[in-house]
Amino acid sequence: MITIEDLKPTPGSNKKYKRLGRGQGSGKGKTAGKGHKGQKSRGTGKVRAWMEGGQTPLHRRLPKFGFKNFTKKFYAVVNLETLEEKFDSNAVVTPEVLIEKGIIDKIYDGVKILARGEITKPLTVKAHKFSEKAKEKIEKVGGKIEVI
């Protein structure tokens, strides 16, 4: 059985710390293992990750491109298959009802209805935008569309 007194560190795992810059006799005196001159021998001695010496840095060699369109609208998207699953016949679907049922978390700049999946129930759908196919499918089964 092993007891706590029997435990010893693995050989080589406890290496004694070498004090630097304490005279030539120590083996790490004078320059303390930093060599002669240069940025890395100085006080802070740090070279930033993006520093490339005199070479033009990568972020300046690469061309600029793109921008953030601040007028872009972001719509909460709902597919017909979701409406089919979550609503009964002749129900009125509004953005507020979609939030209540947990289908969308926010209205953002509006709600857009897309046509993925099939719909068999006639629903009254009120939204900010509809895809052409979604309009066709909703009206085909006797539903109504209202653009808010």
Swiss-Prot record:
The keyword Ribonucleoprotein applies. Keywords: Ribonucleoprotein, Ribosomal protein, RNA-binding, rRNA-binding. GO terms for biological process: translation. One of its GO terms (molecular function) is structural constituent of ribosome. SUPFAM superfamilies: Ribosomal proteins L15p and L18e. The keyword RNA-binding applies. Residues 1-46 are annotated as: Disordered. Transmembrane segments: none annotated. InterPro entries: Ribosomal_uL15 (IPR030878), Ribosomal_uL15/eL18 (IPR021131), Ribosomal_uL15/eL18_sf (IPR036227), Ribosomal_uL15_bac-type (IPR005749), Ribosomal_uL15_CS (IPR001196). GO terms for cellular component: cytosolic large ribosomal subunit. Binds to the 23S rRNA. PANTHER family: 50S RIBOSOMAL PROTEIN L15, LARGE RIBOSOMAL SUBUNIT PROTEIN UL15M. Part of the 50S ribosomal subunit. Belongs to the universal ribosomal protein uL15 family. This is Large ribosomal subunit protein uL15. It comes from Fervidobacterium nodosum (strain ATCC 35602 / DSM 5306 / Rt17-B1).
